[in-house]
């Protein structure tokens, strides 16, 4: 599978917002977005004006990078959202928010979505008592997400959850640190998405 290598802080600076790609570092004064509020590259301080196409593209890239998706993965999710009823943009955000790697990040299983994805593929996470190794697995109400039944997994997850003990949970998730566990109690709503993104611009871009 293709993957991106290289400095991820450049991605946050390119989009002009914190995408929380480096975990706890993004919440400190060392965050590149806070220290250098301009895009990467030569003459980057001259942030030019974007065309309508450019604005739509930036919104799409911002959403992709926030959830750590490749273009093909993003297109598949968009196609699924488009097939459903209701607002396509909101349906897309709900699908991405329900991804197992994103849920594990919100619960505090690991400091970043990238680390959560690695935890899942290495078999450290279970859903309803069964090991799940697919980061794109979509959770549903009633699902119990917890470390796989091994001391190593529980120790890893519990340590990270204690570091994020003060994190506020959205209304559709509940968690306990002892034992380390999260429960899906509902479906995510548009208000639960913390990323400042204009999903309608993404729909317009992908519908061309």
List each language-model region with its residue ranges.
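Short, intrinsically disordered, mixed-charge
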Residues: 106, 121-122
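Short, well-ordered loop/turn sites that connect or cap secondary structure elements
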Residues: 119-120, 139
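Glycine- and Gly-Pro-enriched alpha-helical subdomains that act as flexible
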Residues: 123-127, 131-133
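Beta-rich strand-turn-strand
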Residues: 110-113
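Ferredoxin-like alpha/beta domains used as RNA- or RNAP-binding modules
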Residues: 1-107, 134-208
């Amino acid at each position: 599978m293709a993957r991106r290598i290289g400095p991820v802080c450049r991605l946050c600076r390119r989009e002009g917002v914190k995408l929380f790609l480096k975990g706890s570092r993004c919440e400190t004064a060392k965050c590149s977005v806070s220290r250098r509020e301009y895009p990467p590259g030569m003459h980057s301080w001259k942030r030019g004006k974007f065309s309508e196409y450019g604005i739509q593209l930036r919104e799409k890239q911002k959403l992709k990078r926030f959830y750590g998706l490749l273009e093909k993965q993003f297109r598949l999710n968009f196609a699924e959202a488009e097939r459903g009823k209701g607002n396509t943009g909101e349906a897309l955000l709900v699908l991405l928010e329900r991804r197992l790697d994103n849920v594990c990040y919100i619960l505090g299983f690991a400091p970043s979505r990238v680390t959560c994805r690695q935890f899942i593929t290495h078999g450290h996470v279970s859903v309803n008592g069964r090991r799940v190794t697919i980061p794109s697995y979509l959770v549903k109400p009633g699902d119990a997400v917890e470390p796989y039944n091994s001391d190593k997994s529980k120790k890893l997850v519990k340590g990270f959850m204690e570091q994020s003990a003060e994190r506020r949970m959205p209304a559709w998730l509940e968690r306990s640190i002892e034992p380390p566990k999260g429960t899906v109690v509902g479906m995510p709503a548009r208000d639960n998405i913390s990323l400042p993104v204009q999903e309608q611009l993404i729909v317009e871009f992908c519908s061309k």
